[in-house]
Amino acid sequence: GVQPNSFTDVTEAVQKAIEACRSQQKSVIIFPEGRYDFWPDKAVETKYYITNTSSEEEVPEKKQRVGLYFKKLNNITLEGNNAHFVFHGKMITWVIDSCENIRIQNVSVNYERPGMSEMTIKEITPGSVIAAVHPDSKFAIINNRLEWYGEKWVARNFHAVLVRPSEDILLYSSWTPFLNSKAEVIAPLTVKFTGDFSAFKAQPGDVLTIRDRYRDYVGAFHNRSKNISLSNVNMNSMHGLGIVP
């Protein structure tokens, strides 16, 4: 069985529960409230070409690991009871393919290490930037350069957006001046970048978000299915694109 708050990989056991519904006319999969961890190691591997994601040139191998895989299934309700599903590495949270009457309710979704990295600008001059890195954004300083990394992945192709909470706006930005600068940790989760920031438009309090521009994964995928219902489902983080119907 699957126990909440065990911090062990529940992926295989949950998939067996989903498959057990195949022989039933109507099923309810019930999760007691708590945390459930999903890892890609034993997850179902799929191959989908999904619109508005990475091209064949950017990511030639279209293979995705899936946390919850519904394939040719009908009349299933997943009752989360406010459970918290935490995904690791790069995974699609769920795929619903060639199904009918599937309902997912009362569950929140997050990643142990979100694919988006964040840091808040504290000080900025034409020659330097001091930023506070979000605790969930894992990084290392290697050869005076900041490297963003996650669970079995490293960011290499950067897309940056600046969030200005004071005005509630988003602005296109660039990681290039940081990529070309010298980085050093000056306090816990605080990094000083020294370089040419004369063209970097930001102000203290802005949050710079950085992700890989290649969308090799999506948050969730619904394919050739009908009567799919999501109720009280909170997606706190997703790799790549969002929920693709």
Ranges and model annotations:
Residues 1-29:
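Acidic Gly/Asp/Thr-rich repetitive segments characteristic of extracellular carbohydrate-active
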Residues 124-138:
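Acidic, Ser/Thr-rich low-complexity intrinsically disordered segments
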Residues 195-199, 236, 241:
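Charge-rich, low-hydrophobicity low-complexity segments
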